[in-house]
A protein has these predicted regions:
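Motif-centric detector for short Cys/His coordination patterns
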Residues: 1-152
Length: 152
């Protein structure tokens, strides 16, 4: 197993060097605790036989994860990793696909075909259009309270 050290971060990636000096990276989106951590918290880690551990954050990054084919998330994965407010089960239902399948795409256990990925991205864009047109227009005024619907 390849060993890594000399770990560093920026706003999108975790970087590490292997024993040959080659630099590797992976998305910090896979590790929410590290993404939201302070620089001090990120530097407070230990190195074990199989990876890095942040005790205060209860987070582990394995050495092998730097070599995963999906170390950098796809567009579908990135969207759902950065928009946790989206209910995956309801989004899948709305699209007419199985929620477990969509979760597997998001978590990297399965890879969608190009057509399926396009279908998911189109559904994301449709949701965005619906959000952006919801109730806020130039002539928008809130509905009056029911007690003011008619004057005596």
């Amino acid at each position: 197993m390849r060993r890594f050290g000399n770990i560093s971060f920026d706003s999108k990636y975790i970087y590490a060097e292997d024993e040959t000096g080659r630099r590797w990276c992976q998305s910090i989106l896979w590790y929410p605790a590290l993404k939201n951590a302070t620089d001090g918290q990120r530097q407070n880690y230990t190195v074990g036989p199989t990876g890095f551990h942040w005790r205060d954050l209860d987070e582990d990054v394995s050495f092998e994860s730097f070599e995963y084919p999906d170390a950098i998330p796809s567009k579908v994965q990135e969207f759902f990793l950065t928009h946790k407010e989206i209910n995956v089960a309801e989004f899948a239902r709305r699209m007419g696909i199985n929620a477990t399948l969509l979760r597997n795409y998001i978590n990297g256990f399965k890879k969608p075909s190009a057509a399926r990925e396009r279908q998911i991205l189109d559904a994301i864009h449709q949701l965005g259009r619906e959000y952006s047109s919801f109730g806020i227009t130039d002539g928008y005024s809130p509905k009056p309270s029911p007690k003011y619907l008619s004057e005596p």
